[in-house]
Amino acid sequence: MMTNLFSVFDPSAIFNFSLNWLSTFLGLLMIPSIYWLMPSRYNIMWNSILLTLHKEFKTLLGPSGHNGSTFIFISLFSLILFNNFMGLFPYIFTSTSHLTLTLSLALPLWLCFMLYGWINHTQHMFAHLVPQGTPAILMPFMVCIETISNIIRPGTLAVRLTANMIAGHLLLTLLGNTGPSMSYILVTFLLMAQIALLVLESAVAMIQSYVFAVLSTLYSSEVN
């Protein structure tokens, strides 16, 4: 029995080498195969998903978006989705359950958007601080509120993804720890519950990667 439920997220080392974060790059071994193997139905399905995302992100960015700007958000979606699914397999380090990775994705993106907006579209950024139709007496408060909400954006992006990944894994761990003390009949129901949870976790893995990419796209569209 584990003394701490969160120990399932602890990094481990082999021969004093920390190989945990290599799980983030496992996709590099699998993704290139689509370029030299005959395309299967999975490759065709994946390409259609990426094309749909490209069209949606292009719509969100609007006519002011630069050509090719959707590729960074599609790559972001692919990276997060792959790491979320990798974390569902046993004995594979869940990198997206750590703020180290999620903040490393959210903070530089947000910082680049802010620098680009304030340098190139200063008046447009100032106009965003006061919503249209705000009474004059409320303008100072609205500037403070909009500034705070803008500053916490990378934190909310990172914490949302991390919290969702942690919550599902904790539920699976809690159910798994109760297995040895159950009868054979109850273990059958436990396995069914864990399978249902894994299906839900797969849905969460897809939804959270999509939410992260869409919100990043919306933040980018605000600075144009």
From Swiss-Prot:
The keyword Membrane belongs to this UniProt entry's keyword annotation: yes
Record keywords: ATP synthesis, CF(0), Hydrogen ion transport, Ion transport, Membrane, Mitochondrion, Mitochondrion inner membrane, Transmembrane, Transmembrane helix, Transport
One Pfam family linked to the record: ATP-synt_A
UniProt cross-references to SUPFAM superfamilies, sorted A to Z: F1F0 ATP synthase subunit A (SSF81336)
GO terms of molecular function: proton transmembrane transporter activity
GO CC annotation, single: proton-transporting ATP synthase complex
Residues spanning the membrane: 17-37, 72-92, 99-119, 125-145, 166-186, 187-207
Membrane topology according to the record: Multi-pass membrane protein
Subcellular location: Mitochondrion inner membrane
Coiled-coil regions listed in the entry: none
Main location group: mitochondrion
GO BP annotation list: determination of adult lifespan; locomotion; muscle cell cellular homeostasis; neuron cellular homeostasis; proton motive force-driven ATP synthesis
PANTHER family (alphabetical): ATP SYNTHASE SUBUNIT A
Similarity field: Belongs to the ATPase A chain family.
Role of this protein: Mitochondrial membrane ATP synthase (F(1)F(0) ATP synthase or Complex V) produces ATP from ADP in the presence of a proton gradient across the membrane which is generated by electron transport complexes of the respiratory chain. F-type ATPases consist of two structural domains, F(1) - containing the extramembraneous catalytic core and F(0) - containing the membrane proton channel, linked together by a central stalk and a peripheral stalk. During catalysis, ATP synthesis in the catalytic domain of F(1) is coupled via a rotary mechanism of the central stalk subunits to proton translocation.
Subunit structure: F-type ATPases have 2 components, CF(1) - the catalytic core - and CF(0) - the membrane proton channel. CF(1) has five subunits: alpha(3), beta(3), gamma(1), delta(1), epsilon(1). CF(0) has three main subunits: a, b and c.
Protein name: ATP synthase subunit a
